[in-house]
């Protein structure tokens, strides 16, 4: 690894620790030329499955699109950034765990709703109302009744 201070090629690892629930390695390094210390983080590059849209089109998984939907549902709700990050990580892990190269967009929507139900019931109803295209108040009531069971 190149030293960010002097660009020397030779560095040594002086400490390694697992972070982010074991999904990342934090390494403390020291340059052998200038003796400066710096930290690096390593994560496995995992390929997300492609998404099969309801119209049959296929497209790459768009994490930003998923995050946008979660954030809109959680807007002005008392949910921490850490809890949101964990939900995103959980959804991505479940998608990869399917072992499929392609997944239907409906699966992603259902995983998002599953996480929102845990994070915040109001956000869950917000997301479900758009995702399931609620037409009237009765459908809202039915979904709220399911939450209370």
UniProtKB/Swiss-Prot annotation:
An individual GO BP term: negative regulation of DNA-templated transcription
Keywords, comma-separated and alphabetical: ATP-binding, DNA-binding, Metal-binding, Nucleotide-binding, Repressor, Transcription, Transcription regulation, Zinc, Zinc-finger
InterPro entries for this protein: ATP-cone_dom, NrdR-like_N, RNR_NrdR-like
Zinc finger (unnamed): 3-34
Any matching Pfam family: Zn_ribbon_NrdR
PANTHER family xref list: TRANSCRIPTIONAL REPRESSOR NRDR
UniProt-recorded name of the protein: Transcriptional repressor NrdR
Organism whose genome encodes this protein: Vibrio cholerae serotype O1 (strain ATCC 39315 / El Tor Inaba N16961)
